[in-house]
Amino acid sequence: MSTNFNYVNYLWDEKKATSLGDDQVALFLYRSNILGADLRITNYGGGNTSCKTIESDPVTQKDVEVMWVKGSGGDIGTLTRSGIAGLYTERLRDLKKVYRGIEHEDEMVALFNHCIYDLDSKAPSIDTPLHGLLPFKHIDHLHPDALIAVAAAADSEQITKDIWGDTMGWVPWQKPGFDLGLQLEECLAQNPGIRGIVLGSHGLFTWGDTSYECYINSLEVIEMSSDYIEKKIKANGSVFGGQKMTSLPKEQRLSQAAQLAPILRGLCSSDNQMIGHFSDDAVVLEYINSHDLERLAPMGTSCPDHFLRTKIAPLILNLSADENLDDSKAVREKLTPSFEAYKKGYEAYYNDHKHPNSPAMRDSSPVIILFPGVGMFSFAKNKQTTRVASEFYINAINVMRGSEAISKYTSLPRQEAFDIEYWLLEEAKLQRMPKEQPLSRKVALVTGSGGGIGRAIADKLIAEGANVVFTDISDDFLKEATASYSTDQAIACNCDVTSKESIDTAFAKASLQFGGVDIIVHSAGLAISKPIEDTSQADWDLLQNVLVKGQFLLAQSAAVVFRKQNLGGNIVNIASKNGLVAGPNNLGY
């Protein structure tokens, strides 16, 4: 059994696995975590994994088979015991007796709770029957880019046979749920001995008798599809119809993105304020610079996990890569018609496909925005969500790349996409999300936040839900101040408030990371305690530059970003008690 792979990471640590002994649940969790660590295998929150064990029924004291499966809303990369559901396998299979057909699909979810074995279980997900109706001890349901490329190809079933022969099954697209579980069961009955099943426009199911065998089987199947795609790309000589244009140099791309991000943020925040993210990943640039961009992008994504986070299609900016962005008002006026058209298109999509009981239409602004020659922006309610949306669209690009190489890419019909996006079960999941904090969707830049009052203010802003850019002249202080935060919460930037160039760099970094800035807190300061006769002109100038000129420069740069966003803003200058009653030798006040 080979452990050498070119397109996926082999992460199984035999020493770690051995330390888990024969604890099959622990081994299933370990497998889940290492699968989720490779975004080529499955994206954040996507896919699910399971195992089946023999346990003692607490009432009858008889041995029963229990299925342990990732619960609703979890992520296999970080899955723990508290994130799984334990269900009686036989009782779950008995639900076939009460299943009333696909039009009553959603009522089955409530019945999963009547199959619970472990009373500490996470809520079972909609994919629970897909695992329960298959007999295997360990099962992986994954969303690898290469596999979805096969699943989304126009002749997906034939390509499945071309790659794996008779060792893989195939089922056409079906919304996740009990009916899809029945289709998998039937596929296995018709094709005994297969190693897995390709789900049309969706993903992959693989299995094994042990956690390790399941893991290796998943990697091998993904490797085979990846190898098939890459050989086709090599034979074709190009992807996406070749390159229509070239990207700007890296430094210029970042400069354009930093200038444009606050304008885009404002346009995307017409209904609800958003946080931004920017990517100029090589995969993104290859796609947005290609001849096929205008054909493929409007088609929309295929895998449900993708468009649930990215919306069905992106907005492509009608700007040249080297567009002069100095006049933000003119740029906004140029872009506004595109945003209005996108929003009207989304409203039409909703109205054309909604059902009488559909949830209310959500924000109609684009999530993904493509700027040919520069990169990709994403906007959502918080940094983690917008970053993940960007990652998911990169997954979608990889899927289109693979499908186009081996066949023709096909997206889900709009009605199918709508029925997933506005599924009542998805809406219920959204309603269970924690309530937003007072400063959620806000970005703050705090000077002098490497320590002291500035750091305390920055910490408080984060605690209230804001994203924060910590700035200071000490890299060591900044490193310590931000050590406990992820980059989804805060970033650090060395900034000298006496230098306009340094301040502008901090705002550019904030714009690239979060899309802009809403709150400025000027807390940078210093004290020079000397008698007047010992105070030099340089001392005096430094005090005035930091305490007075710094406020002016900071406010001036903030105003530029605030005007670009057109969302207002707040500037807070921290004053010293010495400004009212100066202490001894504080002549600067």
Regions found by a protein language model. Name each.
Residues 1-444, 456:
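Glycine-rich flexible loops
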Residues 531-532, 539-541:
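Substrate-binding pocket helix/loop in short-chain dehydrogenase/reductase
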Residues 442-467:
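Canonical Rossmann dinucleotide-binding motif of NAD(H)/NADP(H)-dependent dehydrogenases/reductases
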Residues 535, 582-589:
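Active-site loop-to-helix junction immediately N-terminal to the catalytic Tyr of the SDR YXXXK motif
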Residues 555-556:
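A short, exposed helix-loop element centered on a Lys and neighboring polar residues
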Residues 466-480:
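Conserved glycine-rich Rossmann-like NAD(P)H-binding loop of the short-chain dehydrogenase/reductase
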